């Protein structure tokens, strides 16, 4: 079928300089929200106080995956926060620097599922990633950051996207970048916020595009997209966690590799999915086969994007595609 929304703006360059200091009024400079393609500066002054010498976390140094998952389950008790320590530099996992303790044995699915409250229906798509030594390294780094900084969303919401629909119920996949970095917003679904939180700018543009496609769609005024998730829309960020007040701060600890593996298995298992890829990040991170799936591309819904997102017809095109395959369309009301 023809893709009505394949136009994409020129790629944005991610700034290589350190994060800019926000104005005194606390407003991040040129930043709409945490899901926008160009990460902005933190508008929260707190950073972490690191215990000890800042070396490898105890779980990573001890008895391997079992101790690592036990440490994650125990949680960051007694962690304090101050504004004295500098932010962590990005971590690059491409150098193969995985500790021997982290690679001693595959991670156990049952424990992993219990720690993160993952729905067991996702086991065939996620368990193969646990055999990859880089996943142990990822979780060790996640655990270390939980001990030294405030990580969003809460651990019980990192994989909440697995609890709304099973892999066999997914009809549409919408790819985001990383969670919102202000407290009370992120809850594990890309672009979505909790029901008591006003929609951030990018999400407002998404909902406006829905209204343009379906004027009769009901909009409740909040930005919680759980209804979409229960209806078979997988709202998945390529990075599942973030440091409070620091957009893209966890973008290089390895979540993208983990999420990419899950998406590849889902795409192989479920031909005929609709993928909505908004912005160059999503389009470069996830590349489904357009001969097998309906792949829709458009600019990011950020107010900073060159192409206004309100003209995007993805929600209409997605339903038409599903109907051609005798699949029930999505009710995009919120």
Swiss-Prot record:
Its main location: host cell. Pfam families: UDG. One of its GO terms (biological process) is base-excision repair, AP site formation via deaminated base removal. Residues 40-50 have a biased composition (Polar residues). The keyword Hydrolase applies. Changing residue 53 to L: In strain: Nonneuroinvasive mutant HF10. Keywords: DNA damage, DNA repair, Host nucleus, Hydrolase. GO terms for cellular component: host cell nucleus. Its EC number is 3.2.2.27. SUPFAM superfamilies: Uracil-DNA glycosylase-like (SSF52141). It is found in: Host nucleus. InterPro entries: UDG_fam1 (IPR002043), Ura-DNA_Glyclase_AS (IPR018085), Uracil-DNA_glycosylase-like (IPR005122), Uracil-DNA_glycosylase-like_sf (IPR036895). Belongs to the uracil-DNA glycosylase (UDG) superfamily. UNG family. Excises uracil residues from the DNA which can arise as a result of misincorporation of dUMP residues by DNA polymerase or deamination of cytosines. Therefore may reduce deleterious uracil incorporation into the viral genome, particularly in terminally differentiated cells which lack DNA repair enzymes. This is Uracil-DNA glycosylase. It comes from Human herpesvirus 1 (strain 17).
């Amino acid at each position: 079928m023809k893709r009505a929304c394949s136009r994409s703006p020129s790629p944005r360059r991610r700034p290589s300089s350190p994060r800019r200091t926000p104005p005194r009024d606390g407003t991040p400079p040129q930043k709409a929200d945490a899901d926008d393609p160009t990460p902005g500066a933190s508008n929260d002054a707190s950073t972490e106080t690191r215990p000890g010498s800042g070396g490898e976390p105890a779980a990573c140094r001890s008895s391997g995956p079992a101790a690592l998952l036990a440490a994650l389950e125990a949680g960051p008790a007694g962690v304090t926060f101050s504004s004295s320590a500098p932010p962590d530099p990005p971590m690059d996992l491409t150098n193969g620097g995985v500790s021997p303790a982290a690679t001693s044995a595959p991670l156990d699915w049952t424990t992993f599922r219990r720690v993160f409250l993952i729905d067991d229906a996702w086991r065939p798509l996620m368990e193969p990633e646990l055999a990859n030594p880089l996943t142990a390294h990822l979780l060790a780094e996640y655990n270390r950051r939980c001990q030294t900084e405030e990580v969003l969303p809460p651990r019980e919401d990192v994989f909440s996207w697995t609890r709304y629909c099973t892999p066999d119920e997914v009809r549409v996949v919408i790819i985001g970048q990383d969670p919102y970095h202000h407290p009370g917003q992120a809850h594990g679904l890309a672009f979505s916020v909790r029901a008591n939180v006003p929609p951030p700018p990018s999400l407002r543009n998404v909902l406006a595009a829905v209204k343009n496609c379906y004027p009769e769609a009901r909009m409740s005024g909040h930005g919680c997209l759980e209804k979409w998730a229960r209806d078979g829309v997988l709202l998945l960020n390529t990075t599942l966690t973030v440091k409070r007040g620091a957009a893209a701060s966890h973008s290089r600890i390895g979540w993208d590799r983990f999420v990419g593996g899950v998406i590849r298995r889902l795409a192989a298992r479920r031909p005929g999915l609709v993928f909505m890829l908004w912005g160059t990040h999503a389009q470069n991170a996830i590349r489904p086969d357009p001969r097998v799936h309906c792949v829709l591309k458009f600019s990011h819904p950020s107010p900073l994007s060159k192409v206004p997102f309100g003209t995007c017809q993805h929600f209409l095109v997605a339903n038409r595609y599903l109907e051609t395959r005798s699949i029930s369309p999505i009710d995009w009301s919120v």
